[in-house]
């Protein structure tokens, strides 16, 4: 039995497969109906309206309906698309056992413990017929799949067959519906002529639990409490018992016919499912469960799937694997179908049977290995008991008759797997898991000791792949040695590329692609089962899951090509065609669209001409392609796909394409876009576009400064005029300062009432007339005339020597492949050199009316950007004598490769490589590696996600100390700055993909520092000890360890620090408490008692217990003091301490009572709240610190941990990560 899906739930009493979708309904004993997707292994929906167990359940064959019947006497019809009950049918007077839809008519058949069977019309929602005759509970009733018959099983020990042809004729006759509706109130409880008993089958000795028709033959199967499964045959006149299947040793719950084979399946309360051969009446297979009784069986109407419900849930299973055995060589496919070996020519599609296989094995062929040199095949058969597995060696006849193929004598031997390893040798893995090499006569030529393995696969001539529990090993048969290995668990299939350079290892939910040396190139995980695969001619691996055809590129990129209705097994991929076999062993050809993976492959292989061709001609659309191109560093290619202006804008900025970004910004006309474009243009020195952006965003201050630094005084004067119009005094004065216009500054100061400043400006700069006129306006009695500084110096902005009209010159580099293609495809004419406000159309700044101003008084931006004075696209010609041919001497001939565009000869700077610190960040998820790389932000993010750090202040010193160890410096040459080197801890293997930094802090260092903390605790320097313990605790997340033992030691170190910090902080707090009142003394004693429950070193625990003992003795709590004394003596203190303790103990035992009631129960386990220092007894809600594990009462959730001072209490985190092992 192959289990495909299993659920855990309450007892399952009913099951029904959906005829088309991969769904199954389960009705449970607790009243819930579950809808499962058994292919995706997910619960789709739950329906909970029945009161009590639900026993009957059935899907409708065409409509989105299902029916259920329960112990609440109700039949409910549900619509699973609407996810609700449509209506309820009432009429039964006791539990309903089964409910089934008719395959053709709108009928529902229900069987009940009220000893009746009812037929309901679900369209009119009425009962149309009641079948009476049984005199005990009716356990099951089902329609015949094609005839007007009903079979029922009852605890009255009979199986009855009912003829309902009268009901059909009545419902098809004219006026049937009207009479049906009129007569519904008068339905005869004791039956009508609509349904009559045709046969009564008696033979069971106990009550019958189930009866079912055969899908095509006139047979009935029944299962009963007499532990027997009976087969009955019927004709028009009679029915009789054919045979009985005995073997169950408890009540048989259910029995069904196999829809396509001569088999019967039954299950029982004896916790087993049995498969019976109908012709031999013998048991074929038995499947048992340890603790669960079986209650119901269901067969899928179209697929070879079955489901069984038991006490703990249900299972969906197959009796045997349906994967066809096949082998591909060149253009030929050999496969096994119906005990024939067939050969398919991929080119001509000629499919012929070449050989008949010997019969005898009841198990299908498991796998095949083909030898083209000798035209021989090895067919392996797996038994349920692996030790009984066999293989057959056949030589295929050369002149095969496709109509009547020969049945050559094969050589059969025992063995798990047989694989060809040479022209005339094959390897066999025998039942003892040792390797045998055999010749074509099936004779052993040698035995080879191999590493422990449970399966072998072909790996080229003379080589094998050996599978063990968690790896695959490449083994050389000739040299008897291991060549390479790769970690992957439970590989099921191995598929080599045509040139044997790559191999795909397929497991149940994973694919690992390796090269010939078994170096893993990529690892792909699938949620659904991987079924098969084949290599494309271009080196892409095409594989199938249960419901998809997918692709995988050796770099790790993978995706979906198309969806499948049913699983297929890929045999070959060529061009747009996928050749495959289905589960019926029929060869099929599916058409796929390879554009997506060929596009990615061309990008990876840098075949940019192919990429550009596909970009322009293929229908490659979607966000995934754009995201992929961005991720891989090709934003300029992504520009080809994008129509959305916002996305085009961000992509154009990313690849530095200012022209396309400008077009997109004009289309969007968004302030944020103009600001971003201005920033990027400024970085490129394109001040003309910067000017436009500042104009569009009305950023006057930046625009004025831009005009100042480019020396454009004319436009700066216009900006001053605009500021005056806008009544912006500050901007007006600032522009006057930029221009060095003193008289304008004096005027501005005078107009805004700053007479003193205006006078000083005029007098200092020598504007005597203006100064005198201002001086006269001062009132000598009220105002004082300011004094002029005799040492004043002239501060004048430097006059521009050469105004900057053109953009900042950029280094000319040869354009990338795609940028060039975009340029050739794009509009002609680059951005013009001059973006001038004068083009608005004014002769000067005399009158406001002549300015084209917006509501803010700002000049509208020019529209004519990018056009020359003479217009677009005009070429030289006319009067220019440039077309004349000159006769040049032959020695001046220049090779054609040297000439060309101006771009070709320019220097192309090499692309900047990845820095060592960036490599460290890329290769590691450990916080300390990011700190050593100087990437504090990512290190903080990792610490936040892993251990919940939210307060990074205490980490500042640790970060800086760690970062200082991240690099070394050395003097290279005199007069040159020092050089840096970046030490790696894996320096032998360090590189772009696996380099990680050397770490200075070791676990042993922290353990040594722990000893100092112990010493400080012993001498009573508690505050200093807490500080040192906390320093160790915060340092643990910055460790890197190599093995699981060290991970455990680091966790133990955290526990030690936590115990001491909580205990010592509580002791410090206790010593600060006043001792005047009794309540205060009780609180002091409680805290001392709690401290004795910290996990401390014995030397410290002795001190803690002595303190608690003294305090409790003084409080006259002798009973509790006695427990402390006994614990103290168990630790073996010094003799003088032990003597004193025994005296106190004897005094306490004379009067074993407690004078005061304290909040302390030594017998009830508890944790100490690290904030309130009160006990949290086991079973009470508790929140924990994600790093230290310190416990807190729920009210402290979300606060800073008192132990670490950096983490958030109760935060949900990934967990401490200090080793690469924790990421595997």
From Swiss-Prot:
On this chain, the residues bearing Phosphothreonine are 185, 591
InterPro entries according to UniProt: Beta-prop_COPA/B_2nd, Coatomer_alpha_WD-assoc_reg, Coatomer_asu, Coatomer_asu_C, Coatomer_complex_subunit, G-protein_beta_WD-40_rep, Haem_d1_sf, TPR_COPA_B
Subcellular localization: Cytoplasm; Golgi apparatus membrane; Cytoplasmic vesicle, COPI-coated vesicle membrane
Q: Which domain of life is it from?
A: Eukaryota
Where does this chain mainly localize? cytoplasm
Q: Does the keyword Secreted apply?
A: yes
Question: What membrane topology does the UniProt entry give?
Answer: Peripheral membrane protein
**Keyword NADP attached:** no
Q: What is this protein called?
A: Coatomer subunit alpha
* Organism whose genome encodes this protein: Mus musculus (Mouse)
Source organism lineage?
A: Eukaryota, Metazoa, Chordata, Craniata, Vertebrata
């Amino acid at each position: 039995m192959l289990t495909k899906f299993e659920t855990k739930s309450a007892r399952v009493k009913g099951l029904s497969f959906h005829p088309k979708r991969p769904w199954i309904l389960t009705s449970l004993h607790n009243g819930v109906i579950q809808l499962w997707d058994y292919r995706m292994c997910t619960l789709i929906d739950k329906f909970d309206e029945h009161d009590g167990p639900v026993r009957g359940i059935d899907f409708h064959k065409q409509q989105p309906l299902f029916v259920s019947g329960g112990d609440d006497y109700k039949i409910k019809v549900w619509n699973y698309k609407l996810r609700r009950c449509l209506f309820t049918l009432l009429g039964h007077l006791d539990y309903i056992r089964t409910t089934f839809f008719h395959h053709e008519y709108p009928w529902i058949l229900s069987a009940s413990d009220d000893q009746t069977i009812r037929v309901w019309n679900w369209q009119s929602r009425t009962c149309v017929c009641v079948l009476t005759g049984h005199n005990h509970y009716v356990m099951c009733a089902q329609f015949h799949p094609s005839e007007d018959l009903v079979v029922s099983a009852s605890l009255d020990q009979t199986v009855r067959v009912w003829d309902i042809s009268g009901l059909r004729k009545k419902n098809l006759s004219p006026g049937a519906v009207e009479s049906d509706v009129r007569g519904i109130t008068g339905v005869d409880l004791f039956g009508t002529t609509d349904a009559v008993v045709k046969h009564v089958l008696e033979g069971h000795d106990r009550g019958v639990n189930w009866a079912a028709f055969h899908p095509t033959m006139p047979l009935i199967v029944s299962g009963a409490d007499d532990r027997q499964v009976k087969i009955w045959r019927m004709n028009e006149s009679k029915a009789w018992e054919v045979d009985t299947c005995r073997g169950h040793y408890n009540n048989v719950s259910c029995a069904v016919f196999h829809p396509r084979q001569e088999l019967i399946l039954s299950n029982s309360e004896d916790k087993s499912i049995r498969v019976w051969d109908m012709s031999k009446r013998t048991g074929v297979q038995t499947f048992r469960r340890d603790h669960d009784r079986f209650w119901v069986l269901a067969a899928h109407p179209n697929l070879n799937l079955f489901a069984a419900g038991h006490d703990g849930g249900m299972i969906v299973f197959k009796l045997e694997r349906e994967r066809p055995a096949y082998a591909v060589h060149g253009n030929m496919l050999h496969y096994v179908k119906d005990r024939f070996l067939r050969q398919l020519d991929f080119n001509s599609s000629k499919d012929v049977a070449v050989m008949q296989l010997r019969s005898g094995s009841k198990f299908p062929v498991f796998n095949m290995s083909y030898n083209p040199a000798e035209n021989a095949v090895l067919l392996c058969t797996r038994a349920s008991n692996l030790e009984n597995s066999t293989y057959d060696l056949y030589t295929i006849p050369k002149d095969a008759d496709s109509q009547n193929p020969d049945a050559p004598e094969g050589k059969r031997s025992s063995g798990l797997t047989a694989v060809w390893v040479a022209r005339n040798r094959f390897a066999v893995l025998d039942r003892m898991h040792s390797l045998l090499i055999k010749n074509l006569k099936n004779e052993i030529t040698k035995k080879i000791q191999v590493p422990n393995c449970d399966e072998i696969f072909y790996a080229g001539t003379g080589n094998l792949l050996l599978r063990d529990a968690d790896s695959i090993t490449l083994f050389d048969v000739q040299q008897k040695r291991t060549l390479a290995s790769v970690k992957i668990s439970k590989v099921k299939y191995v598929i080599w590329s045509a040139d044997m350079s790559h191999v795909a290892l397929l497991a149940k939910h994973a694919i690992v692609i390796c090269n010939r040396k078994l170096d893993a190139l990529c690892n792909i995980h699938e949620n659904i089962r991987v079924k098969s695969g084949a290599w494309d001619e271009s080196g892409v691996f095409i594989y199938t899951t249960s419901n998809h055809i997918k692709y995988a590129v050796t770099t790790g990129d993978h995706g979906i090509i198309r969806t499948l209705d049913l699983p297929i097994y890929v045999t070959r991929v060529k061009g747009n065609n996928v050749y495959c076999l289905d589960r019926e062993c029929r060869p099929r050809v599916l058409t796929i669209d390879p554009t997506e993976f060929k596009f990615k492959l061309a990008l990876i292989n840098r075949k940019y001409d192919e990429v550009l061709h596909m970009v322009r001609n293929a229908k490659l659309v979607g966000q995934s392609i754009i995201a992929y191109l961005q991720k891989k560093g090709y934003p300029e290619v992504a520009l080809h796909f994008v129509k959305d202006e916002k996305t085009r804008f961000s992509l154009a900025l990313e690849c530095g394409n200012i022209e396309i970004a400008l077009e997109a910004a004009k289309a969007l006309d968004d302030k944020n876009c103009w600001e971003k474009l201005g920033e990027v243009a400024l970085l490129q020195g394109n001040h003309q576009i910067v000017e436009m952006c500042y104009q569009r965003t009305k950023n006057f201050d930046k625009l004025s400064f831009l005009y100042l630094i480019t020396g454009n005084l004319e436009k700066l004067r216009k900006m001053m005029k605009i500021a005056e119009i806008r009544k912006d005094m500050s901007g007006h004065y600032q522009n006057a300062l930029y221009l060095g216009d003193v008289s304008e500054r004096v005027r501005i100061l005078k107009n805004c009432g700053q007479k003193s400043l205006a006078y000083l400006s005029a007098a200092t700069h020598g504007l005597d007339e203006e100064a005198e006129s201002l001086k006269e306006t001062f009132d000598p009695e009220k105002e004082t005339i300011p004094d002029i500084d005799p040492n004043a110096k002239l501060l004048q902005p430097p006059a521009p020597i050469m105004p900057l009209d053109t953009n900042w010159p950029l280094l000319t580099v040869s354009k990338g492949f795609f940028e060039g293609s975009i340029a050739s495809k794009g509009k002609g004419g680059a951005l013009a050199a001059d973006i001038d406000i004068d083009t608005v159309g004014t002769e000067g700044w005399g009158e406001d009316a002549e300015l084209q101003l917006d509501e803010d008084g700002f000049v509208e931006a020019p529209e004519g950007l990018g056009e020359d004075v003479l217009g677009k696209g005009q070429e030289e010609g006319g009067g220019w004598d440039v077309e004349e041919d000159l006769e040049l001497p032959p020695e001046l001939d220049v090779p054609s490769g040297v000439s060309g565009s101006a771009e070709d000869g320019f220097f192309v700077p090499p692309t900047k490589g990845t820095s060592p610190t960036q490599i460290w960040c890329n290769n590691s998820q450990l916080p300390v590696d990011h700190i050593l790389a100087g990437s504090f932000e990512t290190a903080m993010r990792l610490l936040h996600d892993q251990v919940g750090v939210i307060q990074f202040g205490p980490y500042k010193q640790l970060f800086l100390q760690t970062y200082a160890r991240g690099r070394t410096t050395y003097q290279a040459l005199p007069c040159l700055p020092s050089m840096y080197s970046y030490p790696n801890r894996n320096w032998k293997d360090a590189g772009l993909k696996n380099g990680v930094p050397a770490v200075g802090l070791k676990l042993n260092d922290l353990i040594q520092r722990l000893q100092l903390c112990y010493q400080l605790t012993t001498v009573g320097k508690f505050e200093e000890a807490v500080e040192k313990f906390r320093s160790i605790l915060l340092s643990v997340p910055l460790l890197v360890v190599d093995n699981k033992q060290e991970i455990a030691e680091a966790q133990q170190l955290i526990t030690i620090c936590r115990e001491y910090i909580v205990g010592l902080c509580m002791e410090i707090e206790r010593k600060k408490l006043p001792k005047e009142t009794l309540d205060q003394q009780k609180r002091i004693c409680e805290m001392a008692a709690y401290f004795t429950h910290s996990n401390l070193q014995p030397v410290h625990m002795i001190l803690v217990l002595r303190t608690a003992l003294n305090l409790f003795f003084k409080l006259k709590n002798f009973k509790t003091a006695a427990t402390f004394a006994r614990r103290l003596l168990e630790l073996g203190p010094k003799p003088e301490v032990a003597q004193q303790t025994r005296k106190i103990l004897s005094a306490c035992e004379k009067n074993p009572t407690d004078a005061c009631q304290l909040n302390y129960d030594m017998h009830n386990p508890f944790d100490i709240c690290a904030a309130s220092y009160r006990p949290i007894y086991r079973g009470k809600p508790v929140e924990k610190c994600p790093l230290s594990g310190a416990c807190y009462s729920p009210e402290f959730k979300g606060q800073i941990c008192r132990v670490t001072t950096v983490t958030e209490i109760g935060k949900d985190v990934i967990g401490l990560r200090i080793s690469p092992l924790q990421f595997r």
